Structures are given as C-alpha cells and as structure tokens.
Amino acid sequence: MFDEMYYEENNIIPKEEYKHIIDTLHKEKKFRPARISVVRKVFFNREINYLTDAVSVNQENTDSYCVMMTDWDTDHLILEKKSKREGLISKSYTRLSEEEFERILDGDYEWMASARESIFRDFYLQLTINQLRPGVVVDYERQAFRMNSKKEYMIFDLSIRSTYLFTKDTVLSPLLGQTERLEQNRVVVTYKQMAELPGFIYRMTGIKQKHQCLLPEFA
C-alpha cells in the first residue's frame, strides 16, 4: 500500500490553450514526455465533481473510494481512497485483483475485514456500515506530465465520460455506453504539488515518508 499527500488546483481551459501549454512543456526538458491514456474509475458514490476527480461537490472534508483501471488492463486494478481535509488531499492505494473486484461486486466483503492493509479494512467498514455501493463509472482521457523532481504534476483531461447504468459484466468493458461531461473544445487541467510535511505528521498519521513520490502517473 502507498500513501500520498498533496495540494491541487483545477481549472477548465480552451483546447487551444491546452495545445499551447503542451507545445511549451515538450520544449521544457524538465518534464517527462507524456502519453495519453484512458483511466476508468468505478466510484463507490454517485454525487461526484468531475472537475476535482470525485471529491464531493458540497463538502470540504470528504472521502471517496474507487477502483481504477488504466488502458483496459484488468491485471493491474487499483483500489484508491481519496480524502480532502482543509485543502490538503491524501490518497491511499493498493493493488486489487480482478477476482477480488468481482467478489466486492458480488457483495463478498468479509475477506477485507482482517486484511493486512488498512485501506481494505477501512473500505470494509464503509461497505458494511455506510452501505457504500458502486455508483458511477467515469472514463478520463488523461495526459500526465511529471517534473524531474517528482514533486509536481500537470494533468490534462481531454475527455470525461460517465454513466450510472452498468452491470457486473459491463463495468470494466470498453464498450460501456457513456455520456460526455466536458463541453466541446474544453480541457480540464490539474496542477498537483506533493506536500512537504513535518516528520511528526507522518508518524501521527502512519503515512510513510519514503512513499511520498509514488503517486500513479495517471491517478
């Protein structure tokens, strides 16, 4: 399991401005070249803000859970917990097999109750006590740039499609029908900066400092 803490800013820009930024970034050697991937997130809540990647629309302090898949690779699913507290975002994530995801969809949660990784135990409580269920499937056509320092990211969402209508058989399918949420010729840009916190904060929260630069490139 890995943990991250960071700050982020989001905005919607015209596609022409996006192209100008991309041209500039490609000229800057401090940025790694970036490909475009499709990131599917199965969120376990229905009321999400597409601009801020599932942070709740109406609440400043909130948590969200999702299962993430990149480029239709079902062999490398990720369970992700994203929390926002007074502007600071923390994210925990771990590997999830397709079989484990199917067990969750079937309502088989007990195996998570005594799991070694805390994110599974937290998710188990949310599923059993708060009755969280898969609520919306969102696909992001995403391009992520990471600076060489590994502490700053610039992420562009060229398309954001979603649906509330899915089944166990279609939830990971690339053929799942969805509705575009971005206006035409608009791009969502997100700037992320990893948080540098005092050592005692990591000790209090249990987050390991050595994992602070392991944010998945398209998360």
Task: Give the positions of each predicted feature.
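Phosphate-end processing signature that detects enzymes handling 5′-triphosphorylated RNA
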Residues: 1-219
